[in-house]
């Protein structure tokens, strides 16, 4: 599933009904594409191109509130621009996550029970707060540009360029 969101607010979490991949509200409109191959569905939801006249005051941008199916294993690609994003993946089965964001504020909670989750985050002039739920191990490689990086070294000790949970190799969820 790929979500391409522009300027505005994106709220993402679990809660779509059984039989639905997702449900939600999409102020500003969307374009959607989906292709099914066997038991795999590739879906892309993106903001509709638009121009906001300079005289429109109070325009807040796109407002998307999306609930995903908590039972479906997901590869999730998120592209955001100048936005505020609240991404609560705690109850989702996201196995592969890529987040690309520009001038934004992003709060991201990783999955708690998805097994192995691979995460790649690319940020521009952004604020990112990422939470690894208790009971989830992590191996973190942080390449920082102008962004400040703070990692709980008591939980994820640093060694050989990597922050890693002591139980990473044996953890069920990581």
Where are these regions (language model features)?
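Right-handed parallel beta-helix
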Residues: 77-106, 113
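Short, surface-exposed interaction patches in beta-rich subdomains
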Residues: 12-17, 21-60, 97-98, 106-174
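Generic structural detector for well-ordered beta-strands
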Residues: 2, 65-67, 88, 109, ...
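Extended, structured, electrostatic nucleic-acid-contact surfaces
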Residues: 1, 68-76, 111-119
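A cross-kingdom signal targeting lumenal/periplasmic-facing segments of multi-pass membrane
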Residues: 46-66, 75-79, 86-88
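Low-complexity, intrinsically disordered tandem-repeat tracts enriched in small residues
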Residues: 7, 80-82, 103, 125, ...
